[in-house]
Amino acid sequence: MTDRLISGDNHIDLTYCPPDLWSSQAPAKWKLLVPRVEELEDGCHWFVDAVDRGMWNGVGPGFLPYTKGVFAHIDEMKDVGFEWNYQRGAKPRPTTPELRLADLDRDGVDAEIIYGCLMINDLIADGAQRSWANSIYNTWAADFAKASDPNRVFPLAIVPNNDPKDAAAEVRRCAKLGLRGGDLAFKRMGLPIYHKDWYALWEAAAECNFPISFHSTGFKGLRTPDTPAMEKEYFVQHRLVRSALFQLDTMEVLVSLLASGACEKYPDFNFVLGESGQMQSGCG
């Protein structure tokens, strides 16, 4: 049997999403708060919660403009044809089906699991608005997979993190849409993971055979250099410590799930600790 290469941690960052995805469907009270794109002098910018976050179709989760020499791997992408065009009408490669498939073929990747908009729940303050924004993305992601290749492209749903009942309902809805799993942002959850109210979500995930992933976004308890001068002098040391501790925040997730009793109560509930090495995930 031929070995297959499957990426378990690809992404669609917010910067690459369709510019009118949320603003075209937003209730009047949220029109200026939901993720939306405005055209400025240097191109289109994303605004979230009425704050300018940076470029549409920019570089990665930081919404950055492309600058040669900053990131070597970004320069390599540029050399093989990846373009960052900030004007309306551009086709971002990560969210244009035929271009995404072409990039998978170029890299020799047979299939991919896609995390989406990891920071969106950090950028939106209101819980109800976050939940709504998640559902809009999830519907789009299911359609995107079908328009690409549903046997190769597997987007994860963004699971609402403000209310366990909303999260459970969204899991059931997304399972019906054809999505195969979801990502739960645990940094701004309405309740701690070990709280019994989250049983509603674990039950829905087990019922729908819908694994829940927790993707690390970095350990927030790390001490940073005291001054810009110190940061410059100890740049390598600080980056080394930060990189070594990056996945430490998912230890909170693992211990919280074990302490909650979820694994005993829902043995068919499966979970994944994203960017945290390899482990046997699942409660059963």
Label the model's feature ranges.
Residues 1-284:
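Helix-coil boundary/capping segments in enzymes
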